[in-house]
């Protein structure tokens, strides 16, 4: 018989750097999860992606056990890394803060494909290009 789900917690945590300190500790403590066990598992699973923000969905069961699924880093994080910028533009229509090539957009779209609601790589690329535009990043050929 399947275990009964009592809670689902969604967090964005730096890869390989989960600690029991806020915001991770309190969110997991409220759900009744073994915080140290989760942080060790998460850090081991994401050690190869250091420096990236990793979204994670934690499913908590009735017996206080848990499973978690890591997702791909958010598109804005990947775009900022590709463009070599720290912060997106506050006025994306007026101030362009960086640029990415179509090849970089395609690479990001391929990375994000499993988490995006897109039927083709072209549709995923359009989503990533839209995110880039809203951040003040130009897409060049």
From Swiss-Prot:
GO terms for molecular function: large ribosomal subunit rRNA binding; structural constituent of ribosome. InterPro entries: Ribosomal_uL11, Ribosomal_uL11_bac-typ, Ribosomal_uL11_C, Ribosomal_uL11_C_sf, Ribosomal_uL11_CS, Ribosomal_uL11_N, Ribosomal_uL11_N_sf. GO terms for biological process: translation. One or more lysine residues are methylated. GO terms for cellular component: cytosolic large ribosomal subunit. SMART domains: RL11. It comes from the Bacteria. Keywords: Methylation, Ribonucleoprotein, Ribosomal protein, RNA-binding, rRNA-binding. It holds the Pfam family Ribosomal_L11_N. Belongs to the universal ribosomal protein uL11 family. Part of the ribosomal stalk of the 50S ribosomal subunit. Interacts with L10 and the large rRNA to form the base of the stalk. L10 forms an elongated spine to which L12 dimers bind in a sequential fashion forming a multimeric L10(L12)X complex. Forms part of the ribosomal stalk which helps the ribosome interact with GTP-bound translation factors. This is Large ribosomal subunit protein uL11. It comes from Lactobacillus delbrueckii subsp. bulgaricus (strain ATCC 11842 / DSM 20081 / BCRC 10696 / JCM 1002 / NBRC 13953 / NCIMB 11778 / NCTC 12712 / WDCM 00102 / Lb 14).
């Amino acid at each position: 018989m399947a275990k009964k789900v009592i809670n689902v917690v969604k967090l964005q945590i730096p890869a390989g750097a989960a600690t029991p300190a806020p915001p991770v500790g309190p969110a997991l403590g409220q759900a009744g999860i073994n915080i140290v066990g989760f942080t060790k598992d998460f850090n081991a699973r994401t050690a190869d992606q250091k420096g990236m923000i990793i979204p994670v969905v934690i499913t908590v069961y009735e017996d206080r056990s848990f499973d978690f699924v890591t997702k791909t880093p958010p598109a804005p994080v990947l775009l900022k890394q590709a463009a070599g910028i720290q912060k997106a533009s506050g006025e994306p229509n007026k101030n362009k803060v960086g640029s990415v090539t179509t090849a970089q957009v395609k690479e990001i779209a391929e990375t994000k494909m499993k988490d995006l609601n897109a039927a083709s790589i072209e549709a995923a690329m359009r989503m990533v290009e839209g995110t880039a535009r809203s951040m003040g990043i130009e897409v060049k050929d």
